[in-house]
């Protein structure tokens, strides 16, 4: 499972924000500023390609009337304000994995940017800020890639770290001879972070219609107007795709996909993905597409010896969730512990409405915070919870989990499995 996760292609769905000073700096021209922002993201994507990460610009915002936070020369304060704005405003209206602020302000000291370490996929911490410190856009792009590197678990390079160039992306200071290369240390740190945190948001491939930047033929991502994208003509190894035009070669039906074989669609009924478990179904090709559409058993079908019900292709049960939070010996706490969810306090609640925590109704207590008993001699507390103010949703009972016979959790309520949920 771990190796499968590490090998999977990762996608960072990025929103890039430019502040009011940037708007003034580029002559109040939205076109000029947008072009600079697109150029920066294209370079960032090139840099991260070597790490098997595609950076897709899914949102671009320019504060052309006034700043939405108080941008100031203290980078620490500005980062905190920007991250808070992202969590409370931007995330509510635009789905994305990471946000970066490009600012025209001059930060105190030698700082050109700042970001939270290992913040990717975390609502409060997947953010960075970068000063537009140089006319040359690729130097600003390297600075932003550096900050995103922090978000992806990479720390500053030490003297012993090497990448085959004079300076690597995660160098502690700006270099006049920067490179697009990550050091051996950065690669190790990124891998260790992926193993430890296994951030899920970066596994989700954006739709081509989600991308707001102009299509770039040769960036390995099929965008609007393209039929395929196998990289540059020099690097493309795909016989189905014309690298110069990002169009399929004559006679080819497809270039990639589980239902594509030697540039042709596989026959209808060909199995393209085996069933993973009892809540999944074997997926079949249609004969009309290269895609292998994921199918699964209907929600509410009993699974794991009637301990759970299928939900969107998985079988969520409380014991598995306790093990994921507290280790292999963990078990679900006694029913009395779940009564804490009646309180509606900072951790014991069923759901949030407009940022207000709603206490559980008595029949719904098993659809709020999860209570576990970690079976270790050191732990005497029978009602252990996982609660972090930075990620309050972690440690809640997962949607679709069995909460009573014939019932499953949906939006903090224990509902009948015969009704849609």
Curated annotation (Swiss-Prot):
Record text on subunit structure and interactions: Homodimer; disulfide-linked.
Record's function text: Snake venom zinc metalloprotease that induces apoptosis in vascular endothelial cells (VEC), without degrading the extracellular matrix (it cannot cleave collagen) or inhibiting adhesion of VEC. Has also fibrinogenolytic and hemorrhagic activities.
Record-annotated active site: 147
Organism of derivation: Lachesis muta rhombeata
Tissue: Expressed by the venom gland.
Disulfide bridge partners, by residue number: 121-201, 161-185, 163-168, 217-246, 228-241, 230-236, 240-263, 254-260, 259-285, 272-292, 279-310, 303-315, 322-372, 337-383, 350-360, 367-409, 403-414
Residues annotated to bind Ca(2+) 1: 216, 219, 221, 223, 226, 229
Keywords noted in UniProt: Apoptosis, Calcium, Cell adhesion impairing toxin, Disulfide bond, Fibrinogenolytic toxin, Glycoprotein, Hemorrhagic toxin, Hemostasis impairing toxin, Hydrolase, Metal-binding, Metalloprotease, Protease, Secreted, Toxin, Zinc
Segments forming domain Peptidase M12B: 10-206
PROSITE patterns: ADAM_MEPRO, DISINTEGRIN_1, DISINTEGRIN_2, ZINC_PROTEASE
Family as reported in the entry's similarity comment: Belongs to the venom metalloproteinase (M12B) family. P-III subfamily. P-IIIc sub-subfamily.
Chain positions of motif D/ECD-tripeptide: 278-280
Keyword Hydrolase: yes
GO annotations of cellular component type: extracellular region; plasma membrane
Domain Disintegrin: 214-299
EC id: 3.4.24.-
Cofactor binding: number and manner: Binds 1 zinc ion per subunit.
One Pfam match: Reprolysin
Broad class of the protein's primary localization: secreted
Gene Ontology biological process terms from the UniProt entry: apoptotic process; proteolysis
Listed cofactors: Zn(2+)
Class of the enzyme per the UniProt entry, highest EC level: hydrolase
InterPro entries named among the record's database cross-references: ADAM_Cys-rich, Disintegrin_CS, Disintegrin_dom, Disintegrin_dom_sf, MetalloPept_cat_dom_sf, Peptidase_M12B, Reprolysin_adamalysin
Residues listed as glycosylation sites in the UniProt record: 312
Subcellular location: Secreted
Record protein name field: Zinc metalloproteinase-disintegrin-like lachestatin-2
Residues given in the record as Zn(2+) binding sites: 146, 150, 156
């Amino acid at each position: 499972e771990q190796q499968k996760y590490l090998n999977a292609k990762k996608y960072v769905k990025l929103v890039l924000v430019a502040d009011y000073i940037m708007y003034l700096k580029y002559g109040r021209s939205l076109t000029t500023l947008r072009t600079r922002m697109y150029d920066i993201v294209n370079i960032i994507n090139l840099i991260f390609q070597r790490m098997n990460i595609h950076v897709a610009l899914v949102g671009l915002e320019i504060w052309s009337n006034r700043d939405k936070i108080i941008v100031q020369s203290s980078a620490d304060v500005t980062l905190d304000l920007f991250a808070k704005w992202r969590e409370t405003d931007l995330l509510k209206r635009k789905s994305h994995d990471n946000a970066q602020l490009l600012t025209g302000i001059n930060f105190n000291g030698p700082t050109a940017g700042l970001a939270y370490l290992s913040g990717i996929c975390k609502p409060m911490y997947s953010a960075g800020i970068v000063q537009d410190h140089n006319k040359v856009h690729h130097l600003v792009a390297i600075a932003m890639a550096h900050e995103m590197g922090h978000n992806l678990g990479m720390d500053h390079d030490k003297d012993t770290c090497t990448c085959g160039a004079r300076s690597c992306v995660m160098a502690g200071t700006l270099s006049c001879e920067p490179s697009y290369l990550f050091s051996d240390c950065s690669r190790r740190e990124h891998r260790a972070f992926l193993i430890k945190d296994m951030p899920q948001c970066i596994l989700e491939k954006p739709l081509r219609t989600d991308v707001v930047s102009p299509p770039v033929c040769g960036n390995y991502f099929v965008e609007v107007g393209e039929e395929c994208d196998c990289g540059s003509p020099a690097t493309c190894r795909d016989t189905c795709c014309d690298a110069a035009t990002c169009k399929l070669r004559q006679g080819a039906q497809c270039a990639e996909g589980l239902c594509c074989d030697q540039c042709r669609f596989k026959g209808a009924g060909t199995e393209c993905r085996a069933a993973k478990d009892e809540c999944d179904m074997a997926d079949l090709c249609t004969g009309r597409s290269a895609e292998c559409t994921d199918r699964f058993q209907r929600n509410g079908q009993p699974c794991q010896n009637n301990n759970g019900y299928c939900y969107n292709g998985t079988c969520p049960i409380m014991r598995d969730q306790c093990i994921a939070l507290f280790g292999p010996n963990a078990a679900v706490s006694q029913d009395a512990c779940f009564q804490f969810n009646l309180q509606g306090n900072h951790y014991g609640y069923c759901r949030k409405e407009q940022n207000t925590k709603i206490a559980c109704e008595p029949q719904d207590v098993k659809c709020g915070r999860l209570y576990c008993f970690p079976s270790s001699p050191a732990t005497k507390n029978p009602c252990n919870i996982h609660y972090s103010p930075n990620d309050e949703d972690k440690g809640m009972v997962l949607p679709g989990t069995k909460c009573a016979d014939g019932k499953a959790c949906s939006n903090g309520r224990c509902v009948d499995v015969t009704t849609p949920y």
